[in-house]
């Protein structure tokens, strides 16, 4: 997910997306532990998407306060 795509979304949409990614991250972690994970690069991609969403959500929250 690109940063521009994330910035275009509202805070509610970002929170929904964050929840979805956290569930996916849990499932990927579980697959890795059981040896069923095929796309190992997806773990890194999901982790970075979560960080990107959290960062932009924080920026939007700060802008709305100011």
From Swiss-Prot:
<comment type="similarity">
    <text>Belongs to the universal ribosomal protein uL29 family.</text>
</comment>
<protein>
    <recommendedName>
        <fullName>Large ribosomal subunit protein uL29</fullName>
    </recommendedName>
</protein>
<dbReference type="InterPro" id="IPR018254">
    <property type="entry name" value="Ribosomal_uL29_CS"/>
</dbReference>
<dbReference type="GO" id="GO:0022625">
    <property type="term" value="C:cytosolic large ribosomal subunit"/>
</dbReference>
<dbReference type="Pfam" id="PF00831">
    <property type="entry name" value="Ribosomal_L29"/>
</dbReference>
<keyword id="KW-0689">Ribosomal protein</keyword>
<dbReference type="InterPro" id="IPR001854">
    <property type="entry name" value="Ribosomal_uL29"/>
</dbReference>
<dbReference type="InterPro" id="IPR050063">
    <property type="entry name" value="Ribosomal_protein_uL29"/>
</dbReference>
<dbReference type="InterPro" id="IPR036049">
    <property type="entry name" value="Ribosomal_uL29_sf"/>
</dbReference>
<keyword id="KW-0687">Ribonucleoprotein</keyword>
<dbReference type="GO" id="GO:0003735">
    <property type="term" value="F:structural constituent of ribosome"/>
</dbReference>
<dbReference type="GO" id="GO:0006412">
    <property type="term" value="P:translation"/>
</dbReference>
């Amino acid at each position: 997910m690109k940063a521009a795509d994330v910035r275009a979304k509202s805070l509610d949409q970002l929170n929904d997306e964050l929840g979805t990614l956290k569930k996916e991250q849990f499932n990927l972690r579980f697959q890795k532990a059981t040896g069923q994970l095929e796309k190992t690069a997806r773990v890194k991609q999901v982790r970075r998407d979560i960080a990107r969403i959290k960062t932009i959500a924080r920026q939007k929250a700060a802008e709305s306060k100011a």
